Amino acid sequence: MASVSLYRRVLPSPPAIDFASQEGKKIFVEALGQGTMEGFFKLISFYQTQSEPAYCGLATLSVVLNALAIDPGRKWKGPWRWFDDSMLDCCEPLEKVKVQGITFGKVACLARCNGAKVEAFRSNESTVSDFRNRVISCCSSEDRHAIVSYHRSGLKQTGEGHFSPLGGYHAERDMVLILDVTRYKYPPHWVPVTLLWNAMNTIDRATGLQRGYMIISKLNRAPSILYTLSCRHEGWSSVAKFLTENVPLLLKSEDLKDIQEVLSVVFKSPPSELREFITWIAEVRRQEDGNLTLSEEEKGRLVIKAEILEKIRTAGLFKHVTSWLDSQRSRCSTIANLQDKDMLPELAARVCCQGACLLTGCCLSGGKCCCQIDVKHLNVDSKNLATTFVSGTFTTGSSSEQGVDVLVPLCQRGPEGHYIAMHPSTADVLTVLLLALPLHTWSGIKEEKLRAEVTSLVTTEDLPSLLQEEVILYMEPVLQFF
């Protein structure tokens, strides 16, 4: 049986001008001289074709994230960390995207989930003049890139909703360069700004909301955070749904008398995947001839992590969480099981195994891959500050050994010379998770005084700036765009 196949489409011109045409080249040279093609070179270096017909949003974001040199923090293939559209699964299952495509809000969620700063504007929240000014700003810089969501019919093209990055701007012609990620269909092309704006100023039938554009840049902060919401775990959506939808209903349905009862409602029957939902960001390195030293960069990161931990543990909410956890020790529950994983050697054994996998590109399936776990302390300065090294050995498939160190946030020595551990614990995790929940989560608490008390404990406005960043920049976005 014969099947229908297509080889590309003829680019409707006008209104578009093929980038590779003589006129397209002329526009490029002129725009280059105007200084509004600065972002083009980074984008074109990582320009790719979407791997599935409905992956335009994923491929567009993958191009931009790689152009911004954002580290995905996980492997693509072999030992290499690299963004590919098949890896962008933290806000929508890939199988669903493959069939239905992806919406504007979910692409913004994906960008934030993968470490980018996002300024998203639907067409009803902006003007064509604002859009033009932001595009000019992006195209004059290597550090910011614009993604547009538009309906193809507005450009006389076949198809419906589409995402693409913008690669440049020409002032006299008022045209932008669309780097179309469906390269099997249309080549990169220049289009008038006003025409593209009209194509963006349309309704997405899937959501009933306007399309628009977003400006993507790299977060201006070193990767020294303690926690992240592990939205890549298979059960992350059920946990996010429980926290954002079920918890508010549970709080509204019960007569609660104190904060301990509130915490019981939130954590008494969470999905089992909660254990994997919030993750400690550990730092792992190869062992260097048994030499326990820290670079200034390593010291700086560990100091920040220790400061964040200290801010968490001095927060009023932390004291309530600790008290509640103490009351749960005699019970067998998901949260109680979490506490079993709090011991530093057990934590670090898992981490050193994962780290060795990344460092060597060789992982064992099942079994214990780290042995000879050894906890050591190293003085950093004269203020009794020390860091903790947990050293482990990883045996590869060829029976060769690789030593790895897990660097634990700085700790202090107590009055009797004992080190006070500063590694993240269950109480820290739950405190940060509660702070990341939307404020309206608690609005259903019936008792007014209790509701006010809980709200004051979880409000992030009065938190120290380091802890605010930990919650607002790295935790809230995933829950916000669920």
Swiss-Prot record:
The lineage of its organism: Eukaryota, Viridiplantae, Streptophyta, Embryophyta, Tracheophyta. It comes from Lotus japonicus. The keyword Acyltransferase applies. Residues 1-221 form the Peptidase C83 domain. Expressed in roots, nodules and leaves. PROSITE patterns: PCS (PS51443). Pfam families: Phytochelatin, Phytochelatin_C. GO terms for molecular function: glutathione gamma-glutamylcysteinyltransferase activity; metal ion binding. This is Glutathione gamma-glutamylcysteinyltransferase 2.
